[in-house]
Amino acid sequence: MPGTSSARPDSKAVISPIAFDIINRPTPVEAADGRMHLAYEIQAVNQSTLTVTVNRIQARAQKSTIGKSLAGEDLINRTRLNDGTTGSATLGAGESAMLFLDVSYSKKRRNPKTIAHAITTSWPDPVTIGETVKQTFVGVGTKVSKRKAIEVAAPLRGNNWVA
C-alpha cells in the first residue's frame, strides 16, 4: 500500500552536499552605527563523503540582496567548525560548522518579513580528476522575528547589579 504525504514537491529544491539550517529567527536591532542589523547563525552539515567549501553567502529579502555578501576572509572569519577550529570555510566529510551572519541595512528600508540566502559551494569533481564542481542556489530561508529587541538601559532596577 503506497504511503501518503502532506508535503508538496518543491520545484526549487536543490540537492546539495551540505545541509544548511537557520536555528533561530533573527530579530531586527537598531545598532550604535545607526543601521539595522539581523544577527543570526546558519548551521552547515556536510552530509556527503566529499570535502566541500562554502565560497559565498548573500542574504536576500523580497527577491533582492540585503547587506553585504560574505566571501573569502570575511566568510572564513565568521565560520566556526564544530570541532572548535577556525580559519576555514571548508567542511570535510561529515563535518559541521556554524556560520555567524550580521546582515546590516539602512533604517530607511522596511524590516524584511523573511530572508533567504544565495549560497555558493564548491568541491572536487569525483568523476573528472582536477575539475571542480561549483553550485549556487537560493534557499535556506526563515521568517524574521517581529518581537522587539531587548533593550538594556539605565536605570536598571533589582538586586545584585554592579555599576
Where do the PLM segments sit?
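Proline/serine/threonine-rich low-complexity linkers at boundaries of modular beta-sandwich domains
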Residues: 8-20
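Short, solvent-exposed loop/turn segments enriched in Ser/Thr/Gly
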Residues: 23-24, 34-41
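Buried hydrophobic-core signal for structured, non-transmembrane domains
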Residues: 41-44, 119
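Asparagine-centered strand-capping/turn motif at beta-strand->loop junctions
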Residues: 44-51, 61
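Short acidic/proline- and small/hydrophobic-mixed sequence motifs that coincide with surface turns
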Residues: 51-54, 67
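Intrinsically disordered, low-complexity Pro/Gly/Ser/Thr-rich segments with frequent PxxP/GP/PP motifs
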Residues: 66-110
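Terminal connector regions
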Residues: 104-150
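Compositionally biased low-complexity segments at domain edges in trafficked proteins
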Residues: 147-163
